[in-house]
Amino acid sequence: MPRERRERDAKERDTMKEDGGAEFSARSRKRKANVTVFLQDPDEEMAKIDRTARDQCGSQPWDNNAVCADPCSLIPTPDKEDDDRVYPNSTCKPRIIAPSRGSPLPVLSWANREEVWKIMLNKEKTYLRDQHFLEQHPLLQPKMRAILLDWLMEVCEVYKLHRETFYLAQDFFDRYMATQENVVKTLLQLIGISSLFIAAKLEEIYPPKLHQFAYVTDGACSGDEILTMELMIMKALKWRLSPLTIVSWLNVYMQVAYLNDLHEVLLPQYPQQIFIQIAELLDLCVLDVDCLEFPYGILAASALYHFSSSELMQKVSGYQWCDIENCVKWMVPFAMVIRETGSSKLKHFRGVADEDAHNIQTHRDSLDLLDKARAKKAMLSEQNRASPLPSGLLTPPQSGKKQSSGPEMA
């Protein structure tokens, strides 16, 4: 029996080979071909892909098959739709953008300075804020926004997050609120911490974990709620998450002001204490919702003006006095409070390099300072009814009295 079974099985295999030999051969070749493709030189495969891409894109207008004259030239994304610059739910028109200004940037080794400057200015046109967004939320008050942002500053200091992270969160919060209606105050903390959660993941190398963000809310927000709100915010903002923040503009201005002979702008070269002094003025100003009336670049330039001079401001920002005059006057009571109370000393954080310490967001009694600034604003308004210039406005020093070496800072 075993012998007969073996003979019968052998005959069946021979029959199958005769009937389906071609199919088996094709399958075998197919397997070998797949293995060959898998094991071939990846450089050869990438070269084929590059040649195919060049052949397919040869007729595109931006490909002239010529050597690029400027290797630092930036190529715009083709067929990219213009950003929507209007908030659909906003009842107020967005603020007027300041006219384009000349580039103060030096010659850059890594890009064309005019193109970089153009991109920076375009961000101010596409990332809009609405100072009147609270009109869409009858149950909210300006004080609630100030309390929330002050708390976010405190969270940033606890977790040693950067100033850029805080200002990204502030921008996300304000722009998100401009797209919504009738938000209740019980949701503000969730929106704020979710905005900071997004900002930290974008900016920080080692952002805090989700449970750490939930922990600082003292049980008011769960991790799942933060994740849900995170997605809602990003969808409402149409995934536009890379604005040029107030502190980013300040960093650019300070870099240009303290350029060395090599004109390098890759690493900070300005005094940290002066940066902190100006940054704390901006920290106070951003708590007032009226700051959204001005573009971020003007806010940073106005803060720099209050601690330097008109000539330096114009040199590093490209603005003229008429461009920032209203913002400078609006900022006067805030600058007076900062000057009276004094700026904080540079704090050193464990695990943070000394050269990066000024970039860590710090917290002080900002709400008390805000109340003092508003009181001074009311006092100045009373005093200035008969005066064209508000008292306390810093008058630019005369050119003959300026120091000959280095930028002049207060």
From Swiss-Prot:
The keyword Cell cycle applies. The modification Phosphoserine is found at residues 103, 387, 399. The modification Phosphothreonine is found at residues 77, 395. Gene3D superfamilies: Cyclin-like (1.10.472.10). Residues 1-20 have a biased composition (Basic and acidic residues). PROSITE patterns: CYCLINS (PS00292). The keyword Phosphoprotein applies. Highly expressed in testis and placenta. Low levels in bronchial epithelial cells. Phosphorylation of both Thr-395 by GSK3 and Ser-399 by CDK2 creates a high affinity degron recognized by FBXW7, and accelerates degradation via the ubiquitin proteasome pathway. Phosphorylation at Thr-77 creates a low affinity degron also recognized by FBXW7. CDD domains: CYCLIN_CCNE1_rpt1, CYCLIN_CCNE1_rpt2. GO terms for molecular function: cyclin-dependent protein serine/threonine kinase regulator activity; kinase activity; protein kinase binding. Its main location: nucleus. GO terms for biological process: cell division; DNA replication initiation; G1/S transition of mitotic cell cycle; homologous chromosome pairing at meiosis; negative regulation of transcription by RNA polymerase II; positive regulation of G1/S transition of mitotic cell cycle; positive regulation of mesenchymal stem cell proliferation; protein phosphorylation. Residues 396-410 have a biased composition (Polar residues). InterPro entries: Cyclin (IPR039361), Cyclin-like_dom (IPR013763), Cyclin-like_sf (IPR036915), Cyclin_C-dom (IPR004367), Cyclin_N (IPR006671), Cyclins_cyclin-box (IPR048258). One of its GO terms (cellular component) is cyclin E1-CDK2 complex. Keywords: Cell cycle, Cell division, Cyclin, Nucleus, Phosphoprotein, Ubl conjugation. It is found in: Nucleus. Residues 1-30, 378-410 are annotated as: Disordered. Interacts with CDK2 protein kinase to form a serine/threonine kinase holoenzyme complex. The cyclin subunit imparts substrate specificity to the complex. Found in a complex with CDK2, CABLES1 and CCNA1. Part of a complex consisting of UHRF2, CDK2 and CCNE1. Interacts directly with UHRF2; the interaction ubiquitinates CCNE1 and appears to occur independently of CCNE1 phosphorylation. Interacts with INCA1. Belongs to the cyclin family. Cyclin E subfamily. Essential for the control of the cell cycle at the G1/S (start) transition. This is G1/S-specific cyclin-E1. It comes from Homo sapiens (Human).
